[in-house]
A protein has these predicted regions:
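Glycine-centered hinge/linker elements that transmit conformational signals in sensory
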Residues: 124-126, 166-195
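Short, solvent-exposed loop/beta-turn-alpha elements that line the ligand-binding surface or hinge
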Residues: 62-76, 131, 136-144, 158-179, ...
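A structural signal for short loop-to-beta-strand junctions that line the ligand-binding cleft
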Residues: 32-36, 40-43, 71-106, 135, ...
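Hinge/lid segment of periplasmic solute-binding proteins
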Residues: 28, 48-97, 112, 121, ...
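Extracytoplasmic/periplasmic substrate-recognition and gating elements
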Residues: 87, 108-109, 177, 188, ...
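Extracytoplasmic/periplasmic solute-binding protein
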Residues: 88-90, 97, 121-168, 211
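Conserved C-terminal helix/tail region of periplasmic/extracytoplasmic solute-binding proteins
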Residues: 107, 312-367
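Conserved N-terminal structural module of periplasmic/extracytoplasmic solute-binding proteins
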Residues: 1-54, 113, 195, 245, ...
Length: 367
């Protein structure tokens, strides 16, 4: 289930011997508990901005300054993720969701590259009458984290703010309603089972020629040209995420590596050396297009173009530093589906999401 860059990194780590890796899309849910055990169930953890914040707040990851001084003099400043002056993670790549589309189909139909969601909808409507693909659009709308992330991307793209004074929620507004309406409009051109669609599901829809466009993680781009599993090699173009009213409707992320605090210094020393083997230049040269790497040796190719264009078009960083964001993301992931399926209208869905957030935020002391 892991995306290609993590497969590359963990394979490089395995060359050290005595290294076992678990690749799980739901890693964030198990990692916090695994790191809290003493000794930790894992010594090395793969993280993104959001998962990193959870571990920092839990106090279960080890400062890396001593190990960076000993083994990491080659690391770039952009790779050293610091909190209060201490290095707590080593970043290896940047990531965002951006538009991927079947360039061959768009050319055959005389359609221009979509720049907005309205462009996507117009292209999908036109395409549908030709019956070229099963569904014109794919979407990572799986109920839970993925669906919450779709709202976050589009709400920020429209200039939305999640919180007011004292961490109070602030999504039940015109921007929130517009965001929901855009999301629902896109579902009309998706597989009706879109609420089970995670990144792997949408990647496979693309590879099997079932969809013509989707906003998908940049780390999935290289898989489109993997001849062993893709029927659309050379046909999927990478482009910027659709523009919202304020900026590209996506969030910028980093992925990297942390060490658990609940292990011995000797184990940490060994684990860090394994990490350095996993994210070295040799690995990048062998897997250049698997990610937008922060590691020396990386050369940006066509697979990275969409991620780079999305960043250029102003995509906001995922707001993981906001204290209430974890609870907000969870409430969104659990609550947006009721609007998409017609169970609730937009205002009711947003009010209920805010209410769920308030309960969680009150219980945790944020409000």
């Amino acid at each position: 289930a892991g995306f290609d860059s993590w497969k590359a990194v963990t394979s490089a780590m395995a060359e050290c011997g005595n290294v076992t890796s678990t690749l799980d899309q739901d890693f964030k849910d198990v990692q916090a508990d695994a790191f809290a055990v003493n000794p930790s169930l894992y010594q090395i953890g793969g993280v993104n901005n959001s998962a990193f914040s959870i571990l920092v707040n839990a106090g279960t990851i080890r400062p890396l300054d001593d190990l960076v001084a000993k083994y990491g003099s080659h690391l770039k400043p952009s790779q050293l993720i610091k909190v209060n002056g201490q290095i707590l993670a080593i970043a290896m790549q940047v990531n965002n969701q951006h538009l991927m589309y079947r360039e061959d189909i768009f050319k055959d139909l005389g359609l221009a590259e979509p720049k907005t969601h309205a462009d996507m909808l117009a292209a999908a409507k036109f395409m549908q009458s030709y019956n070229i693909v099963d569904y014109p659009i794919g979407g990572t709308y799986k109920a839970g984290w993925n669906l919450g992330e779709e709202f976050v991307n589009n709400y920020l793209g429209n200039g939305g703010e999640f919180f007011g004074e004292g961490n109070a929620p602030s999504i039940n507004n015109a921007t929130g309603v517009a965001t929901l309406n855009t999301m629902k409009a896109l579902t009309e051109y998706m597989d009706p089972e879109y609420l089970v669609g995670d990144s792997t599901y949408v990647q496979q829809q693309f590879q099997q020629g079932k969809i013509a466009m989707a906003t998908l993680w940049g780390t999935r781009a290289a898989a489109m040209d993997n001849a062993e599993e893709s029927t659309v090699v050379g046909k999927v173009k990478m482009a910027s995420a659709p523009m919202g009213t304020s900026r590209a409707a996506a969030t910028n992320w980093w992925d990297g590596i942390v060490l658990a605090s609940n292990m011995t210094d000797e184990q940490a020393d060994t684990a860090f050396r394994v990490v350095m083997e996993g994210i070295d230049t040799e690995m990048v040269l062998a897997n250049n297009d698997a990610a937008v790497w922060l590691v020396d040796g990386y050369v940006a190719g066509s697979a990275a173009q969409g991620a780079l264009d999305t960043a250029t078009n102003g995509a906001a960083p995922y707001p993981s530093s906001l204290a209430g964001m974890g609870a907000m993301h969870s409430a969104l992931g659990n609550g947006v589906g009721a609007f998409l399926t017609g169970e609730k209208d937009a205002a009711t869905a947003l009010a209920d999401i805010e209410a769920a957030y308030i309960i969680a935020a009150t219980e945790s002391g944020l409000m």
